[in-house]
Amino acid sequence: MKKTFLGTGIALTLLSACAPKQSQETLTKSGLNPTNYETIVDGVKPVKLYTLKNAAGMEVCVTNFGGRIVSIMVPDKNGNLKDVVLGFDSIADYQNIPSDFGASIGRYANRINKGVIVMDGETIQLPQNNFGHCLHGGPKGWQYQVYEANQLNDSTMTLTMKSPDGDANFPGNVTATVTYALTRDNAIDINYEATTDKKTVINMTNHSYFNLSGNPANPATDHILYVNADSITPVDSTFMTTGEMMAVTETPFDFNTPKTIAPDVTNFENEQIKFGNGFDHNWVLNTKGDINQLAAKLTSPTSGITLEAVSY
């Protein structure tokens, strides 16, 4: 009998003081041509671009190749719509240029030490694709697979992945579902659920890269960041977590008082900044899954766009 073992999510709210200016819609609001995302993978799996929108004028484009968020359009302080995530203009780019832009990562986001897991005394060797570790489910993780898409209405869709027992040597037949839902107040609610018929490991996430200025040529290091966390999980030189927790007090990782990402992001005298080539770590949130507590907040002073994140 299958058992549900995961149900978690994150809500990202993008805030602006202005309503979007009206414009003539030809392609998507982000200028994407949906035909550039239409293809067949593995001879039988159709891929396309899906568009979600809400009454406030927000638009999110998603491809079922990797369950990826391709664009997020929200109004800036002047009412001009801006795309605040990195993405490609065609499905061919996602297939030919290795990246995790916007992807629904699985089976296991981040690294598994030396690619080894132990289940009920059995040692299982997983693919080693990053400094001898298993990163993001291996070289053929879900971010490079085709999800089954179902758009429920203008603002909500589900993406389902069926991963067989032994997929990348992970145990268990797993069915995982990602739900993207836009709310009236410009939040993206991302919910993850999964079932398995065998003891296994799973750790899903979304891998979007945000630049709230709306211009990828502008460095995001001027963004003002708040993170509700008192510690991080430090890493070694292979970027594997050590199993410890490190207090952020009096370190570059302390964002309990909002501050710009620069100059601390390039403080390479700090060993953890050096190992991560900047901020690329896990913050241990104080929120403990409480959706009423803010986990993080990011603001672009250029665009006036703010991203608020909660986790549950």
Question: Which residues make up each language-model segment?
Answer:
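Bacterial Sec-dependent N-terminal signal peptides
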Residues: 1-29
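An exposed, glycine/acidic-rich loop-and-rim segment of catalytic or binding clefts
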Residues: 19-58, 64-312
